[in-house]
Amino acid sequence: MASESKSYARRDRLLEIEATVRKWWEDEDVFRAESCENLPKPGEKFFSTFPFPYMNGYLHIGHAFSLSKVDFASAYHRLRGANVLLPFGFHCTGMPIKASADKLRREIEQFGNPPVFTAEDTTKVPEVQEESSDTIALPIPGQFKGKKSKVAAKAGGQVYQWEIMRSFGLTDSEIANFREPSEWLYYFPPLAVEDLRAYGLGCDWRRSFVTTDVNPFFDAFVRWQMRKLKSMGKIVKDRRYTIFSPLDGQPCADHDRATGEGVQPQEYTLIKMEVVKPFPLKLGPLEGKRVFLAAATLRPETMYGQTNAWVLPDGKYGAYEISETEVFILTERAALNLAYQNFSKNPQEPSCLVELTGYDLIGLPLRSPLSVNEIIYALPMLTILTNKGTGIVTSVPSDAPDDYMALQDLIKKPALQDKYGVKTEWLPTEIIPIINIPEFGDKAAEKVCLDLKIKSQNDKEKLAEAKRLTYLKGFTEGTMLIGEFFGRKVQEIKPIIKTKLIETGEAIIYSEPEKPVMSRSGDECVVALTDQWYITYGESEWRKIAEECLSKMNLYSDETRHGFEHTLSWLNQWACSRSFGLGTRIPWDEQFLVESLSDSSLYMAYYTVAHIFHDGDMYKGSKSLIRPQQMNDEVWEYLFCDGPYPKSSDIPSAVLSEMKQEFDYWYPLDLRVSGKDLIQNHLTFFIYNHTALMANRNWPRGIRCNGHIMLNSEKMSKSTGNFRTLRQSIEEFSATGTRFCLADAGDGVDDANFAFETANAAILRLTKELTWMEEVLDVESSLRTGPPSTYADKVFENDMNIALRLTERAYKDCLFREALKNGFYDLQAARDEYRLSCGTGGMHHDLLLKFMDVQTRLIVPICPHFADYVWRKVLNKEGCVLTAGWPPSNEPDLVLKSANKYLQDSIVLMRKLLQKQLSGSKKGAKKGAQVTAVPEGKLKGLVYVNEQFDGWRAHCLRILQSRFDQQTCSFPPDTEMLAELSATLLQEGKNLKAIQKVCMPFLKFKKDEAISIGTQALNLRLPFGEIEVLQSNKDLIRRQLGLEEVEIYSASDPDDVSIAGPHASLLTQNPPSPGSPTAIFVTSTSVCPPS
């Protein structure tokens, strides 16, 4: 293997095969999808899609992982005989391309063309290290060796777009062209098509298109969709708090973000705590104005209990001009958010009058709304986070554990007071009870801190637990003890108090991102109060319809369903308009563009007719018989919404009928596959829009979500070099190795792992399999013929039937790792076991050919290039394997499967017994057990079988037989059966602990077996004859154990036992039981001859 490990020959052979097969597919146009006049019956067609990717770079393995799921599913249905449509489009809407192009333009203006960056301007990205492999060492083409990458750019650091473009392999002269956004649209989509063709995507490329107004047909489609939603009252203009990019000057939706996808605005009540005059010297410039410490709180109802305010001593603050008369003291970050919410003298521009630190604020006397204390003071708190809220915190020690412990630290530690210049008279003298909470009383924070033995404000874990215990209960069960709402529930009066504070001018509404959000342009986002167009997701009646649709869909996992249900529970109005970027203009308000998650919720319908517009030209559709301006609302209504025939249209009636037929045939969408992160936006929008615009019969049928992909168990990141484009992966591992590895990476919604070791092993395994098939077929005349008759023949054929059924189920459930296990790994193991079992008799000709046929077809969805090559060139079959049909199979014989497992397990057991007897079992000797050592040499195996359970095992089986529910195929809880078993065995003097230790594993094993193969598993005998199975395979046992001879005997027959002679004692030491034979290994002279 040493020379082979340095060779690329195996990988190169797969690449050659793929090129050959790709040419066949192109010549035969195998993925062309045509509708029929008659509507399809269930199962006759399969229409699936993948969210079209952004075209601001090459496709990578992350794209390929999600895409592989829909590709495998489509290929499976194609193999089963369905008419399959899998289209693929390219998304260019929104900010990603525009932001990148603008970055290039700025870099050229600042640093020249090509730009000259200084050493300080750039940060080197570690080079990709070549992966090691025990099988094949392959080169890594196109290593990313540039500066900091796009992933690094997402962190918001100084990363140059020019260097990112260089990492794509572009020259400086080429890069300059990308300052124009249109260059991206024409450069990357054709490269993506190349990569996807090499990958083997089963796509009808006639239907491909790009978004934005560069494609006038799609532009017309989106305009119709938006007008339709507006006419239905589902698009409105409103002022709402929205995540906003100051640099871009517009809202920043999920797909416009580098980090923070899914983050929503968090609303606070901003309490205005007025600074009591006279002002200290530091605040002198603010004379003549009302100055407030502005504290953001989620609990306005607790303001009655304020004892002080908190500031961070080392924190940086500012006095910001909110209006002509009012000044707020808070952090710069909070001031910026307020400026975008119309709380700044200069809109969107915070005006700082005085820069301050927390030290400057300590000791300020304050009047705070609702507080029982007329004057409270600003005191130091060491755990305040200035990236959350305003940096000013209200203190309510009766109900906030953090406040209670910080106050205790100050009161009990004079040194801390001295350090920060805190005067004794500033410290509150008592805690004010304001809320009674069952379990915690009227000073919940004090009680929980004492209960948890919290020592200081720095005990973060215990304080977090204290908050968890008290906060929710305070809201749901708390009762007010003070003020005009005395005796009323907190959850009732909280919104009332909030409204009252705002109406009296003692507080305002303040909002900020609940977590940091970075735009793709590189700035940190704020929350802005914007006046723009919104889609009314979350509206009660619309939500009910969306929930109805969801309830009927196949979502393939409970986690996915829970994710959608949660999203539907909170999703509200969505800003659908943007001021900058690429896309379609809002038709009634053309100063705005349709944002990228709003033009991508219904385009699956566009795919059904896209080939009539484009026919391979993904841009303007130069070959089309239709002009874009002919696609008016009346035509779209007719095609997609059961509207009347558009009599005024000058589109030929035959073309209109063809488009209508295409949509009616392919819709509804059978499957959409995506990463789980799109549940919270795109996929839910997809459901909402279909339920609003489509008839019930055309609602989507299924969504399958997956997790993210890791490379070699590490997060995929170009900045660390742990990254692969799809093109790189194909060059490195071949398309076949890449696809195999993607299937093996994982099912479900958890993160999966693309392991290079697996891809390399796939290359080795598949090329070896190809060689084996060719070698077998070269000598097929020497293979055994006639009816398959041996035990090994029957087992092998049964294993193929089992693999067919399990693989079919896995593909149907979109469990592709499971399909690979059942349809490849397990099938390979069955073939290897068959080859070993056949011995001198040889393998059967027909069974081997059936195996090659079955193996080839089962791997079609995952490795189509390999499968089609084997089908045509190795097996000499007619036609293309992609549509060859699912292999026929017989009903699997589960008893035979169980018998073969018994045989294999018995051989393993016998091997252990042989090793034990040959060694004299030192372990057994130490324990004083009698062990007979056998001299080395030619040995004979005496295998003893007890075919019927007795004793406590028989008791267990009788109980299981009586308690098995055949309708539900289930048993009652173990505790019930153990009680029944104990009642019987305790009467016989058995110890209860001994019963549990010995019986429970046996009970569990037999329960599982019964659920798997039926009640026959509960018989006192196994569902097959053990002696018969072992007798039929004596030669296999002999060869596997290296024995001269093997005989099978019954342990219940005294004559058989006597044959063991002096070694019969071993049957007492290790008595056989059903499923567990005992073997004695002797020389031929040390046994008694049969009588």
Swiss-Prot record:
Gene3D superfamilies: HUPs, Valyl/Leucyl/Isoleucyl-tRNA synthetase, editing domain. It is found in: Cytoplasm, Cytosol. It comes from Arabidopsis thaliana (Mouse-ear cress). It catalyses: tRNA(Leu) + L-leucine + ATP = L-leucyl-tRNA(Leu) + AMP + diphosphate. Disulfide bonds: none annotated. Its EC number is 6.1.1.4. InterPro entries: aa-tRNA-synth_I_CS, aa-tRNA-synth_Ia, Leu-tRNA-synth_Ia_arc/euk, M/V/L/I-tRNA-synth_anticd-bd, RBD_LARS1, Rossmann-like_a/b/a_fold, tRNAsynth_Ia_anticodon-bd, Val/Leu/Ile-tRNA-synth_edit. GO terms for molecular function: aminoacyl-tRNA deacylase activity; ATP binding; leucine-tRNA ligase activity. Keywords: Aminoacyl-tRNA synthetase, ATP-binding, Cytoplasm, Ligase, Nucleotide-binding, Protein biosynthesis. ATP binds at K718. Catalyzes the specific attachment of an amino acid to its cognate tRNA in a two step reaction: the amino acid (AA) is first activated by ATP to form AA-AMP and then transferred to the acceptor end of the tRNA. This is Leucine--tRNA ligase, cytoplasmic. A motif ('HIGH' region) lies at residues 53-63. A motif ('KMSKS' region) lies at residues 715-719. Belongs to the class-I aminoacyl-tRNA synthetase family. One of its GO terms (biological process) is leucyl-tRNA aminoacylation. GO terms for cellular component: chloroplast; cytosol; plasmodesma. It is an enzyme of class 6 (ligase).
